[in-house]
Amino acid sequence: AMTKRINLFIMVSLLSVLAMAQGKKSFTLDDLLPGGSTYHQLQPQNLYTAWWGNRLVETDLDGCNEINPKNGSKKVLFTLQQLNQWLGAGEDSSVVRSCYNVEFPDGGQPWVATVVSGKGKNGGKPTSIYTVVDFKSRKKVWEQEYPADATALDRSPSSNSLAFVRQHNLYVTTKEGQTMAVSSDGSNDLVYGETVHRNEFGITKGTFWSPDGKQLAFYRMDQSMVPDYPQVDITTRIATTYPCKYPMAGEKMHKVTVGVFTPTTGQTVWLQAGDPTDRYFTNISWSPDNRKIYMIELNRDQNHAELVRYDAATGKKEGVIYEEEHPKYVEPMHGLLFLPWDSSKFIYQSQRDGYNHLYLFDLSKPQAPQRHKTFQGGACEEHVEVTPLTSGEWVVKEVLGFDLKEKSLLFCSNEIHPLQSNIYKVRVKDGKRTLLDNGEGVHYGSVNADGTYVEDRYSSPTVARSISLTDTRNGKGRNLLTAEDPWKDYNVPEITCGSIKAADGTTDLYYRMVKPVDFDPNKKY
């Protein structure tokens, strides 16, 4: 953060001193720093959206509008005033202040969901209420109340049960409102349902609902053996100490186990993974039939990983599906992605050839372990049939979803240029790739329920922001927004991109260079 501020200060100073263009403004820190009085005025216009099944909805300040993918026209679904009325607000009051963060939890139902504040029956302590409203019948469908100080919220879209953490203990509240404690001995030394391993290996949460929402896998982390590392919280009026558990290199690290809780029985079983000492458990995934759990297990040296399958009902280890090792490191970052049309196959992401790519695993074709050499002295061992789905000297950056009819997968990659991100689809049966955008700049996408449309958000050095709705079958897009350049009245420096060779004379190192306004190539800066 300090480096970014220094860079911004240098840039603003150069712009202020060297700006020579007639009639143009010079940037100030208020213009460029988040929190500045004019910062938001210099951000490009945006369009806030959410998917309602296969339909794209504009979630605006004052209401929600369905967007027609063929012509971009909008149809009002409901207004903010109407939503507040349905939530029980009076004429001169409001329960929610905007529609930016509403959700559409069921693609087949005219339901909108939001969170409102409330006071529960537990002594008047503040609560939050997840409320679902039918905007066709204009009535509440159901509500779910939970403590306002709850963290790590994880709601199952199938059962509508909610998992949450409070004071390091894990709880589950069912759709009917019954709350049960999964743990009771949580503390700073023993935490449940939270992220573990300091968020390494793609870990972003600590709970994992089964597809049907009837079972909950969760992390339990014993960090009592890890010493407190002193930190200072400078956000308080007077700085306070804020110790955290940090396993220093060569010192003892925390021990993680994985449990599976069933709300209908109130029982927990534990995966029989063995001694957790000096091991990492990550990328927890459920099988589509809710019966198996897959987990990637690494040693502390982080140079050997195993993909292991467990029986969810008993916790018994069933076997190893895949192994990967490398003399430097192995870094699994993603869980399994099962094909919606074939539950015996899943997509696995690996950097085993030096670049992150997609591999198709077929569980219906077990085999004697096949060992292969991989990138720079690494090796992998396949216990089922594995087919590379993508390959090359480029990186798969993000998987967006599936086109269910064409049986394709949509993803972002930097195949065109290392500094770009573009949207592709790849046909699973043969690996045929199709570019779905203009091949320029940086694109981010989100896909509707059946993969027929992708919302494409694009920017480049000459395009502030462009948002389109693209048909994934033919690649044709309908522009929804092209933002005007908010910097057009300012002295903007020239920004160039390029590459230089590393010390080995072979490796390309890519850069972005910001030149002073009125740059003189003959002048030494």
Predicted feature locations:
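Bacterial N-terminal signal peptides that target proteins for export
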Residues: 1-10
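Short intrinsically disordered, low-complexity coil segments enriched in acidic
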Residues: 1-2, 74, 385, 521-524
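Basic side chains
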Residues: 4-5, 220, 425, 512
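Bacterial N-terminal signal peptides
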Residues: 9-17
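Beta-propeller folds
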Residues: 21-447, 452-453, 461-465, 470
